[in-house]
Amino acid sequence: MQQLTEIVEQALVIIDQASDLKALDDIRVDYLGKKGKITDMMKMMGSLSPEEKPAFGQAVNDAKQAIQQKLTERIDGLKSAELEAKLIAEKIDVTLPGRTIEIGGLHPVTRTIERIETFFGELGFSVKQGPEIEDDFHNFDALNISEHHPARADHDTFYFNPKLMLRTQTSGVQIRTMETEKPPLRIISPGRVYRNDYDQTHTPMFHQVEGLLVDEHVNFAELKGVLHDFLRNFFEEDLQVRFRPSYFPFTEPSAEVDVMGKNGKWLEVLGCGMVHPNVLRSVGIDPEKYSGFAFGMGVERLTMLRYGVNDLRAFFENDLRFLKQFK
């Protein structure tokens, strides 16, 4: 019995000293395996008297259970320590600032178009789109632009053939709308247009927004009121606005609209007028019953004025140093 007690005490000490799971498994085999020290003690049962066997057998089982319990406790302890060490190594310091994702911004031209659409949308105007490759009827004839008008010259227009071209304005969208829908009409038509020009204030492709309202008893005073409100909303200040008499083939009377700049000079911002009766007739609308007004504005020009940009070409150069200012 003394020998059994020493074996158990020795085993418990060795188990406490084990530093990993493999060492514990080796101890288990050494003491509880088929050739282990506790198993060898069971073989001594044959040399004992019948009276001694029960007590000895119980002592061996107790020793076996003590070693097994100690092994289990030590295994659990090592696994817990291993998990804790892993968690410490992988822990997240919640006091550190988060990793932010840099959010891009809308291009200034896109921002301007959205601003225009929002304002006129609140007035009941719907947004219409049309083809960028246009025929001469929708781009010129229906707009009261005669065959010999300077706008039809090769140096101003990109032609595919004499009857097909890149549109020079989005007015064709207005014509297509009036062909398919009956008055009353309130639309704006934003989009890309093309003209053969390139310098500090012109590019071969630029963006326009044109507007059209057709109904009974429409007058010039309503046009002035709408554009006054739009310009003050767009520039977010109570601007001084003037309407200068002008000429456009598709409107009569026609006007160009200026705003007073911070330098005390007038700046042209858009053109407008009452829809010419010939334009209404070309799409089957009776000019004796209906009247309307139209207006058109260059998006890049408005954007330049709003943000203080001096060179139109900056909008198309994709320079991040420039574009990041508008985030």
Swiss-Prot record:
It catalyses: tRNA(Phe) + L-phenylalanine + ATP = L-phenylalanyl-tRNA(Phe) + AMP + diphosphate + H(+). InterPro entries: aa-tRNA-synth_II (IPR006195), aa-tRNA-synth_II/BPL/LPL (IPR045864), Phe-tRNA-synth_IIc_asu (IPR004529), Phe-tRNA_ligase_II_N (IPR004188), Phe_tRNA_ligase_alpha1_bac (IPR022911), Phenylalanyl-tRNA_Synthase (IPR002319), tRNA-bd_arm (IPR010978). It is an enzyme of class 6 (ligase). Mg(2+) binds at E252. Binds 2 magnesium ions per tetramer. Its EC number is 6.1.1.20. Pfam families: Phe_tRNA-synt_N, tRNA-synt_2d. GO terms for biological process: phenylalanyl-tRNA aminoacylation. PROSITE patterns: AA_TRNA_LIGASE_II. Its cofactor is Mg(2+). One of its GO terms (molecular function) is phenylalanine-tRNA ligase activity. Belongs to the class-II aminoacyl-tRNA synthetase family. Phe-tRNA synthetase alpha subunit type 1 subfamily. HAMAP family: Phe_tRNA_synth_alpha1. Tetramer of two alpha and two beta subunits. This is Phenylalanine--tRNA ligase alpha subunit. It comes from Shewanella oneidensis (strain ATCC 700550 / JCM 31522 / CIP 106686 / LMG 19005 / NCIMB 14063 / MR-1).
